C-alpha cells in the first residue's frame, strides 16, 4: 500500500523518546543484561528500520517476528544480532545463515524435518523456545529441550540461547506468572548443556518483575512509551509515548437539526451543528468502532459522529474552523491529550493493536 503523502494525515515518531524509554527501563533492571529491542510489526507501527538505526548503539540486538522482517533490517544496513521470535521452517535456514540471522527452534519435529532435508546447520545461530505455559510454540519438558540442543549441535548449529514468554506478566494476579517462571527456571537449571543467553523478560516482566530477569531482556512495547498492561497496573516510572497521530480539517459545514451524517444514517443532528470532515478512516487503521470516540481540535475534545468510513471521519465541532486547522487523534493538542490506551479501551482491545493497525497509507515522520 502506497503512503498517502499528499494529505495532512501523519504519524509523528519521536525517536529520542524511544531512546529515553530504553534508558529508563534498563536503569531499573538490578543487574547487567543484554538488551534486545523488539521491532517486529514495523516496530509496533513506528517504523522498524528508522527505530533500529536510531537505537542501534543502545541495544545488543533486535527481535523480529519473521524472516522478511529480519531481511528488511539487514538490507537497511543493520549489522547487530537479529533474532526471529517466530518459527521459520527449515527451508529458510540457508538464507538465515547467509544473512547471519538467528532462528528460534521450537520442537523436535523441526529438527527431524531439517535432518530429513539433509540440511547442514553449520553457521546457523539459534535459540530454543520453551513453552512454560503460553500454549503456543516451544518444547514442554527438560528431555525435549536437552534432545533438541544436542541434535542441533550435532548438525553444526550454534545454540546461543533459550527463552520463554510469559502470558500474564502484565496482570495484577501474578500466580500464573510465578508458575511459568518456576517451570522455566527449573528447566534451565537442569539442562545438560545450557546456552549462553537465557531470556524470559518481555516489557511487562522488565517493568514489574525486574528482579526475576535472567541475563538477557526483550524490550517491546515499553520502549515506544506504552504501558503493557493498558491501565491495569501503574507504571513505577515515567515513559514517553513516541507516536502521535495528526490530521487536519478538509471540510466544514453547518447542518440544521434533523440531518443525517454518514453511512447507515446512524447519527442525526439534534440542533444546528458544525460538522468537520477529516481525511482518515478504517483503511488507515482508524477503525469503525471508534464512532462515538473523540479527537482534539483547538484543545477541545470533539466527538466522532456518524460511522467511520474507509477514508474519512466526521466530527462535531464547537464552532466553525478554517480548512487546514490541525486535528490530533493521538497525542497532545492545546493542553488536551488522547493516548493509544484510551483509543484501545474505546475499541475493547489493547494499545499494541491500535498502533500496529496504523496502515502504510499513513506516512511516518521522524524527529
Curated annotation (Swiss-Prot):
<feature type="binding site">
    <location>
        <position position="310"/>
    </location>
    <ligand>
        <name>substrate</name>
    </ligand>
</feature>
<feature type="modified residue" description="N6-(pyridoxal phosphate)lysine">
    <location>
        <position position="40"/>
    </location>
</feature>
<dbReference type="InterPro" id="IPR011079">
    <property type="entry name" value="Ala_racemase_C"/>
</dbReference>
<comment type="similarity">
    <text>Belongs to the alanine racemase family.</text>
</comment>
<dbReference type="Pfam" id="PF00842">
    <property type="entry name" value="Ala_racemase_C"/>
</dbReference>
<keyword id="KW-0663">Pyridoxal phosphate</keyword>
<dbReference type="GO" id="GO:0008784">
    <property type="term" value="F:alanine racemase activity"/>
</dbReference>
<dbReference type="InterPro" id="IPR000821">
    <property type="entry name" value="Ala_racemase"/>
</dbReference>
<dbReference type="GO" id="GO:0009252">
    <property type="term" value="P:peptidoglycan biosynthetic process"/>
</dbReference>
<feature type="active site" description="Proton acceptor; specific for D-alanine">
    <location>
        <position position="40"/>
    </location>
</feature>
<protein>
    <recommendedName>
        <fullName>Alanine racemase</fullName>
        <ecNumber>5.1.1.1</ecNumber>
    </recommendedName>
</protein>
<dbReference type="InterPro" id="IPR029066">
    <property type="entry name" value="PLP-binding_barrel"/>
</dbReference>
<dbReference type="GO" id="GO:0030170">
    <property type="term" value="F:pyridoxal phosphate binding"/>
</dbReference>
<keyword id="KW-0413">Isomerase</keyword>
<dbReference type="GO" id="GO:0030632">
    <property type="term" value="P:D-alanine biosynthetic process"/>
</dbReference>
<feature type="binding site">
    <location>
        <position position="136"/>
    </location>
    <ligand>
        <name>substrate</name>
    </ligand>
</feature>
<dbReference type="Pfam" id="PF01168">
    <property type="entry name" value="Ala_racemase_N"/>
</dbReference>
<comment type="pathway">
    <text>Amino-acid biosynthesis; D-alanine biosynthesis; D-alanine from L-alanine: step 1/1.</text>
</comment>
<dbReference type="GO" id="GO:0005829">
    <property type="term" value="C:cytosol"/>
</dbReference>
<comment type="function">
    <text>Catalyzes the interconversion of L-alanine and D-alanine. May also act on other amino acids.</text>
</comment>
<feature type="active site" description="Proton acceptor; specific for L-alanine">
    <location>
        <position position="263"/>
    </location>
</feature>
<dbReference type="InterPro" id="IPR009006">
    <property type="entry name" value="Ala_racemase/Decarboxylase_C"/>
</dbReference>
<dbReference type="InterPro" id="IPR001608">
    <property type="entry name" value="Ala_racemase_N"/>
</dbReference>
<dbReference type="InterPro" id="IPR020622">
    <property type="entry name" value="Ala_racemase_pyridoxalP-BS"/>
</dbReference>
Amino acid at each position: 500500500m502506497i503512503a498517502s503523502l499528499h494529505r495532512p494525515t501523519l504519524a509523528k515518531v519521536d525517536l529520542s523518546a524511544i531512546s529515553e524509554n530504553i534508558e529508563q527501563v534498563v536503569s531499573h533492571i538490578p543487574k547487567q543484561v543484554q538488551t534486545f529491542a523488539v521491532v517486529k510489526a514495523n516496530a509496533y507501527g513506528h517504523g522498524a528500520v528508522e527505530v533500529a538505526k536510531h537505537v542501534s548503539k543502545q541495544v545488543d540486538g533486535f527481535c523480529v517476528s519473521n524472516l522478511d522482517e529480519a531481511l528488511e533490517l539487514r538490507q537497511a544496513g543493520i549489522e547487530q544480532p537479529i533474532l526471529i521470535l517466530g518459527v521459520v521452517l527449515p527451508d529458510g535456514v540457508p538464507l538465515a545463515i547467509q544473512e547471519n540471522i538467528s532462528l528460534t527452534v521450537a520442537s523436535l519435529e523441526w529438527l527431524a524435518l531439517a535432518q530429513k532435508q539433509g540440511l547442514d546447520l553449520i553457521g546457523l545461530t539459534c535459540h530454543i523456545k520453551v513453552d512454560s505455559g503460553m500454549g503456543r510454540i516451544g518444547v514442554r519438558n527438560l528431555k525435549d529441550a536437552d534432545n533438541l540442543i544436542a541434535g542441533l549441535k550435532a548438525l553444526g548449529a550454534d545454540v546461543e540461547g533459550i527463552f520463554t514468554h510469559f502470558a500474564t506478566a502484565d496482570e495484577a494476579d501474578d500466580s500464573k506468572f510465578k508458575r511459568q517462571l518456576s517451570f522455566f527456571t527449573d528447566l534451565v537449571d537442569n539442562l545438560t548443556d545450557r546456552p549462553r543467553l537465557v531470556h524470559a523478560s518481555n516489557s511487562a516482566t522488565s517493568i514489574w518483575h525486574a528482579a526475576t530477569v535472567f541475563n538477557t531482556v526483550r524490550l517491546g512495547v515499553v520502549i515506544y512509551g506504552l504501558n503493557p498492561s493498558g491501565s491495569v497496573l501503574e507504571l513505577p516510572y515515567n515513559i514517553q509515548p513516541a507516536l502521535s497521530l495528526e490530521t487536519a480539517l478538509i471540510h466544514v459545514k453547518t447542518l440544521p437539526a434533523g440531518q443525517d451524517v454518514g453511512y447507515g444514517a446512524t447519527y442525526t443532528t439534534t440542533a444546528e451543528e458544525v460538522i468537520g470532515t477529516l481525511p482518515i478512516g478504517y483503511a488507515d487503521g482508524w477503525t469503525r468502532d471508534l464512532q462515538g470516540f473523540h479527537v482534539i481540535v483547538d484543545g477541545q475534545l470533539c466527538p466522532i459522529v456518524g460511522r467511520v468510513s474507509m477514508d474519512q471521519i466526521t466530527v462535531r465541532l464547537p464552532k466553525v474552523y478554517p480548512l487546514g486547522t490541525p486535528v490530533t487523534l493521538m497525542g497532545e493538542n492545546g493542553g488536551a491529550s488522547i493516548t493509544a490506551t484510551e483509543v484501545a479501551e474505546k475499541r475493547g482491545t489493547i494499545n499494541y493493536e491500535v498502533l500496529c493497525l496504523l496502515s502504510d497509507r499513513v506516512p511516518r515522520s521522524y524527529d
